[in-house]
């Protein structure tokens, strides 16, 4: 079965006064129908810029997608003109933004915003589109959807707004859904409900999901495969089970080692083996990357070669890829 989404050698840069910021470099991945691929990493690793590049929402200037392809059902989005891309965006590929309060139009009711998109992509008349909007709000388990459809974003709670964003994203049954940290600003209970909701709708519509997150707990709960990014590049890719059981690159090892475990000892009596391990150092500036592996200055396993020669991203074990000279 051919992947619904195929991303090949995607590179995005920003032209700034301090130089060229290489936000995303040679990123490739694919996602099948009904599959969830998680992209994880620290703030500034390039995961959100990757998501915005898929949607062609990079502000130009200062940003620019300089190379690569993003294919949805075989159509390369990077080769489309803006009117054609506008039809794809929200139609075949949709996005749930991190903060719905800034993504939703504060001057339009929720129902009108959903209906407007349905009219654009599916060609429904106004009344049928409004009916679809109410149906989608009901679908995402918003109580009293008829009344809520007439409300403005500021009249809803954070969890309710995120549900409305999901309803809008899925109203036209897209083939690909990009979810950029969809639960970051929500409390744990609402977070779980939103993730369950995305999973339920994904199974119903067969949508391919690209989940952007820094939360490895969310990855373990929802994704089938995971891509780990660092300083704009992929450093590891594997199934979720394989990555958690057998991380190969020192960076994912460090991320997993820094996660508190339920039931672990606390206080000053913790043994060295039980202590949380931090990753020393700082993420390098993307306009001044080191010549070799970008993680080498922070890596406890780095050899001289790591500082001068960038490792290739290659197959290390069956269906398990990494970019590291030491694995």
PLM region spans:
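Conserved ABC ATPase signature
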Residues: 151-156, 160
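ABC ATPase NBD coupling module
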Residues: 66, 77-94, 112, 120, ...
